[in-house]
Amino acid sequence: MLLNTLSPAAGSKHAPKRLGRGVGSGLGKTGGRGHKGQKSRSGGKVRPGFEGGQMPLKQRLPKFGFTSRKSFVSAEVRLSELAKVTGDVVDLNALKAANLVTKNIEFAKIVLSGEISKAVTVKGLRVTKGAKAAIEAAGGKIEE
């Protein structure tokens, strides 16, 4: 089978109605656009959210909150993902080497999700209470 020989099954596709080709077609003269107005013209569109000059909903509602810039350089790592780290010391560079966090990450936190079987030493990372208990139960330790 060649891609350039593929075609739809016979009768499965209908040709679209051609606009502006006589009154008898049902789509002659104005071609389904109605009479006059911005939307009848070529290129006649209004931008998304435009409400005809009325104050748009987006501007009627109050602003709220903000996005912390620290969230762009912070990441969470699941406990089960620590198995992908080679070696027994887990720090930020080890997480980057194992492709668990991207290169722009500066802060990481280990959270309790899944299980850990090997003993690891966690250095310079924040750890949740549950994850800390699980790491220590597996024979590992946490260093600041």
From Swiss-Prot:
The keyword rRNA-binding applies. One of its GO terms (molecular function) is structural constituent of ribosome. Coiled coil: none annotated. Residues 1-57 are annotated as: Disordered. Residues 32-44 have a biased composition (Basic residues). InterPro entries: Ribosomal_uL15, Ribosomal_uL15/eL18, Ribosomal_uL15/eL18_sf, Ribosomal_uL15_bac-type, Ribosomal_uL15_CS. One of its GO terms (biological process) is translation. GO terms for cellular component: cytosolic large ribosomal subunit. Keywords: Ribonucleoprotein, Ribosomal protein, RNA-binding, rRNA-binding. It comes from the Bacteria. The keyword Nucleus does not apply. Residues 21-31 have a biased composition (Gly residues). It holds the Pfam family Ribosomal_L27A. Binds to the 23S rRNA. Belongs to the universal ribosomal protein uL15 family. This is Large ribosomal subunit protein uL15. It comes from Vibrio cholerae serotype O1 (strain ATCC 39541 / Classical Ogawa 395 / O395). The gene is rplO.
